[in-house]
Amino acid sequence: MGPIHNYFGVVCLGIAASVYFRPECALYGSRIATFAVLLTGIAISKLLYQLFIYPQFVTPLKHFPAPPNRHWLTGNTGSLLVDTPHALMKEWAKTIPNDGILRYYIVGNMERLTVTSPAVLREILVSKAYEFAKPLVIQQTLRRVLGNGILIAEGEEHKFQRKNLKPAFAYRHVKDLYSVFWSKGTEMTKLIRKDLQSRKAPDDNTIQVRTWASRSSLDIIGLAGMGRDFGSLQDPENSLSQSYEMIFATPGLGTKILFILGMLLGNTTWLAKLPTKQNRLIDTGCRNIRDATRRMIREQKAKMEDPNAAAEVDIISVAMRSGNFDDDNLIDQLMTFLGAGHETTAGALQWAIYALCKHPDVQSRLREEVRANLPPIHGENPGPIDAATIDSLPYLNAVCNEVIRFHPSVPNTVRVALNDTTLMGHPIPKGTQVVISPELVNHMPALWGPDAERFNPDRWMGPGKANTGGAASNYAFLSFLHGPRSCIGQVFAKAELACLLAAVVGSFAFELKSPDAPLEVREGATIAPKDGVLAKFTPVEGW
């Protein structure tokens, strides 16, 4: 926390030692009372230092511009929560002159930097990718749910995991999975139709998109990740699906406040040990998922040992054949694929449906392209699909890219400097936390033009724009990050979204149940509509 705070701690430690060895020095003759007073003094000193002294007099980052009007408790955000202030960050980036780095304070006057230029992004994500890591509190929080897979691993361990998993996510492998994505998309649309047909009132056609998106993406991860159909679409009460419902439930206000306390203390492991209802649900869900993945690994190994069995193309089989992962690490990778993979794609599909409800002209145009180029899926013999067919639809890919740009499922990530370093020549002390925000960068007019904050798939149409959106830099599109810590599954995720969205938009016309209601979001490791997307689905016949 700084020399003043450290000095006070040393003094308190010295007093405590004196009292321990010389009881006659204790307050009121009680060691317990003395230690209680000392601990209270340390806590108060840390709080005063954090709230008042450090940001005003001590911070070594004063040379970076910051917003005015910092509050002693809520910093520059005006919020008692740790949610990233995306709207404020966008305004700061526009109005505060900076050369790529801004400084601000969140609740408790905890200091953060955020990045606004491609040059700084390139430095932190590529050239110095392993000089910055996820903060310990974030690692602890995510590891509990996702295991110590590629998303959490750091340093040499991450390099090892990425090198050995990369072949499983290469396009030459993912293209063979398009048929899996498409089959689940068609299964989902048929089940939605069946659901609508079973309802008594003809105007009862509201669909909760979240549940269908989550179950379809979970089934896809099962098939593509480990060659196993979880059957979540067919069975809403599927144990694996229910486990994730437990884990990803929106945390209550009390949990958020305790998390802030954990951040101030620099450690959140104790939060998981509190006897709260949410912890019990998360522990049960995680235990169920870990037990299930352990069984899957065991069964998959037995299948691979059979000399007569056909070679599997799922991701975990590719990882097994490399021979570089033991069972525990394979379980961690499966936990990561299942949790992070299905949650982000489910969120992306929800955002896609929401965007198409808000832009019916885009929805109609996309439906025309899909129905004109893809085989019907509601006849007796639905036609097959392959990667080349899906990839050849320019407007489908433009819409998917714009959804991912405009509504990044992971709106921000945080990195902490592991050692004293520099960014663009500016000194960055060890422990400095840097917020990298796709939500900010993906909407910057300086990179995307004056319509940066408008949903516009046409920006991805035309010569040379299919992969860039016409942006001024490839670092303008930050949804999958860049460099060695970029999302290893981005090709997989984009293909999955394209197949699911094509199946839905080709089969239904949809509009929001309450089009004028304000959008509320649920923000955690990912961001999605708070209560899901409630949309009225109307089957469109003839396809």
UniProtKB/Swiss-Prot annotation:
Cofactor(s) the protein requires to work: heme
Molecular function via GO: heme binding; iron ion binding; monooxygenase activity; oxidoreductase activity, acting on paired donors, with incorporation or reduction of molecular oxygen
Transmembrane segments: 1-21, 32-52
Topology with respect to the bilayer: Multi-pass membrane protein
Chief location: membrane
Keyword Membrane listed: yes
InterPro entries for this protein: Cyt_P450 (IPR001128), Cyt_P450_E_grp-I (IPR002401), Cyt_P450_sf (IPR036396), Cytochrome_P450_monoxygenase (IPR050121)
UniProt keyword list: Heme, Iron, Membrane, Metal-binding, Monooxygenase, Oxidoreductase, Transmembrane, Transmembrane helix
Use case: The sphingofungins A, B, C, and D, show a limited antifungal spectrum of activity but are especially effective against Cryptococcus species, fungal pathogens causing opportunistic infections in human.
Any single biological process term in GO: small molecule biosynthetic process
GO cellular component assignments: membrane
Entry's family note: Belongs to the cytochrome P450 family.
Family annotation (PANTHER family): CYTOCHROME P450, P450, PUTATIVE (EUROFUNG)-RELATED
Protein name: Cytochrome P450 monooxygenase sphH
Organism: Aspergillus fumigatus (strain CBS 144.89 / FGSC A1163 / CEA10) (Neosartorya fumigata)
Lineage, highest ranks first: Eukaryota, Fungi, Dikarya, Ascomycota, Pezizomycotina
